[in-house]
Amino acid sequence: RFLPQGGQHPIALGAAMCCDSGHKTLPVVTGGAYLHLGKNAPVQDEAAVRNALALFGSTSPSYLILQSLDKCNQILSEGYPLRLLQCCGHLTRLRRELNEAAAAKHCPGPLALESEPLKVTLDAAVLGLSGTELAEKLRAAKIECEYADPRYLVLMFTPDNPPQDFERLAAAVLCIVEELVGPVTLPEETAGEFAELERGLHRCCTIRQAVFAPQEQLPAEQAVGRICAMPTVSCPPALPIVVSGEQITPAAAAWMKRYHVEEVSVIREPQ
């Protein structure tokens, strides 16, 4: 929203309405968010929107959260776009530095991938590591990532990160790159496996029916053929391997094992 290419915001792209979380990368207390109405929203009356929110809202709201949103509004109006642009510049240089170091060590691909302006996505596979292994190495250097999976690792930055944070990450990753010995082979592409998973899934009932049905927990490998009741995702929001109401296939169970999903909730079968 505050970058020169701010047209990427959902409202600018035509959304009628969207909710922006304020507590991830802005100085807002957890739980704070902004509700935006676009020009094509079906309701434009602010009072009507507030009344609709009151249907599910509390009569005792957190004034601490609301106050933090008001304070954040002040920060956003006082030079925030320039600070944000400077942060993005730091990250662009960081990605370039990491990729140049990886290329110098003959890594089989770019280390820092193209991603959102405030995120650094690292392909740990080009270092011969899994994303979780790379996360452990960074944790030893007192750097905590936002997300790690069997291949990738994601870090998030804000304009409030001081310059030494960028330098510390660069130093830690460059040290790992320098330790590389011998050629690294990238794992095979998994696009075909995703396609196989999609083809094999079959919906047996609606999501609502599955979520409210009697359930039981089973080891993932024993759940093949059963109907998923509640999806298991490692880092919400995320794409579930199987959606509630779908039958769990061998391919789905294999993906659960890959992402370390040990148990899954299934609809209990009648006795």
Residue ranges: model-predicted function:
Residues R1-P108:
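Conserved PLP-enzyme active-site core in the AAT-like
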Residues G6, T30, S60, P236-P237, ...:
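Solvent-exposed, flexible loop/coil residues
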Residues L13-A15, T30-G31, A141-K142, P237, ...:
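Short coil/turn connectors at secondary-structure junctions
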Residues C18-S21, V28, Y147, P250, ...:
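General beta-strand structural signal in soluble alpha/beta enzymes
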Residues K24-T25, N40-P42, P61, K71-C72, ...:
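Short, glycine-/Ser/Thr-/acidic-enriched flexible segments
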Residues N99, A103-A251, W255-Y259:
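Conserved C-terminal alpha-helix-loop-beta "cap" of PLP-dependent enzymes
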Residues K257, E263, R268-Q271:
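Terminal helix/beta-alpha structural elements that buttress the NAD(P)+-binding lobe
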